[in-house]
Amino acid sequence: MKNKKAIFPGTFDPLTNGHINLIERSIKVFDKVIIIVANNFKKNQLFNLKERMHHIKKATKNYKNIKVIGINDLTTNFARKNNIKILIRGIRNIFDFENEFIMEKTNKYLYPEMESIFMISDINWSYMSSSMIKEIIFYGGNLDYFLPECVIKDIKKKIKRKIVRNLN
């Protein structure tokens, strides 16, 4: 499967060590992995698009075959315009599979030439979700195991700014 480009889309809000694990595994399979950072109108976002792109670039700075792009478009439109025919998705559990199965059928309708490659999450990350991470943040829990250091630093800055704002 080498000599191929693939896209790995997501909101990455926040970027987790589970995402990093999938990125590391993807670059072993594909020559180039384009990480697409998107907005999700259904989710309350902790970080804006630019911040999320910065986190990914910083956390993956030592990987040569990665490109990080932010989009406000359908992933299938981006893939078609750039002649990319492989989409990577992580599957943590049976619920993810159900959602990804439906999304794959929609993507196939929108861009029939694109194939979805599902990567099963390592057991260490199979339970992790952005909702769980946001709850840990809200209650001040330890994030060291779950998030890259650059993301933790920015979360602490955001919390500090919010506390200062609330004091004024």
Curated annotation (Swiss-Prot):
Residues annotated for substrate binding in this entry: 11, 43, 75, 89
MF term (GO), any: pantetheine-phosphate adenylyltransferase activity
Gene Ontology CC: cytoplasm
Class of the enzyme per the UniProt entry, highest EC level: transferase
Signal sequence coordinates: none
Chain positions of site Transition state stabilizer: 19
EC annotation from Swiss-Prot or TrEMBL: 2.7.7.3
Localization (cell): Cytoplasm
Gene Ontology BP terms: coenzyme A biosynthetic process
Swiss-Prot/TrEMBL cofactor(s): Mg(2+)
Pathway listed: Cofactor biosynthesis; coenzyme A biosynthesis; CoA from (R)-pantothenate: step 4/5
Residues binding ATP, per UniProt: 11-12, 19, 90-92, 100, 125-131
Keywords: ATP-binding, Coenzyme A biosynthesis, Cytoplasm, Magnesium, Nucleotide-binding, Nucleotidyltransferase, Transferase
Primary location class: cytoplasm
Top-rank taxon, per record: Bacteria
Reaction catalysis annotation: (R)-4'-phosphopantetheine + ATP + H(+) = 3'-dephospho-CoA + diphosphate
Function as written in the Swiss-Prot or TrEMBL entry: Reversibly transfers an adenylyl group from ATP to 4'-phosphopantetheine, yielding dephospho-CoA (dPCoA) and pyrophosphate.
Quaternary structure and interacting proteins, as annotated: Homohexamer.
Family: Belongs to the bacterial CoaD family.
UniProt-listed HAMAP family: PPAT_bact (MF_00151)
Protein name as it appears in the record: Phosphopantetheine adenylyltransferase
Protein source organism: Wigglesworthia glossinidia brevipalpis
Recorded name of the encoding gene: coaD
